Amino acid sequence: MTAEDAPMPATSRAHNQRTVAGYERCARDYAAEVGSTPSPEGAAALRQLADAVAPGKRVLEVGSGPGWDADFLETLGIEVHRTDVTASFRDFQAERGKRCDRLDVLVDDIDGRYHGIVMLYVLQHFERAELDAVLGKLAQALEPGGALLLSYAEGDEECWQHGDSGDYRVVRWTREAFDARLAQAGFVPAWEHAFQGKDLPWRIVLARRQA
């Protein structure tokens, strides 16, 4: 049995479901809070992805949320397949006339191949033991040389953040540990940007799948 085939431990599954439940209750408030225009850091990262993917090629977005990043990528000529595990976000996008499919990257297979994948502000909600399987799954879904844009919270702590809508799992990574996992999955970092967010330090990485 490979890491991709291994079932998710019950504790990990419960932690993820607890986090998703929080987002189910706050999707509209979250959409309003983050705003429809990407932050300067986010816009720069999305442009890096667009530059790495030929116009008209398909990009998979994992954790599309309200869909603002996908909207921005589409203005750059990128075709985006939006996905999210949270029904409230999918419903929000449907009301905007956007199709967002259900995908739980922790347990679901990814159908098809893509020239790019974007997964921003998602990985911090996954347990440490889940990262290898997720990265392996993303690598399999990318064409050789394809681009992966993702972000993670820097540090080495694991904690819960508690809000009015629920509890959110946060797992942070050191740069060295995260890059080692990327390399193990067959990715080579090509661009990065580190910045201080509202509550946590973040790093955004654009990595290429080795041919």
Segments (PLM) and residue ranges:
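Conserved acidic residues
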Residues: 115
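A conserved beta-strand element that flanks and buttresses the S-adenosyl-L-methionine
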Residues: 118
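Short catalytic micro-motifs in class I SAM-dependent methyltransferases
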Residues: 121-125
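Helix-to-beta-strand junctions that scaffold the AdoMet/dcAdoMet cofactor pocket
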Residues: 126-128, 142-143
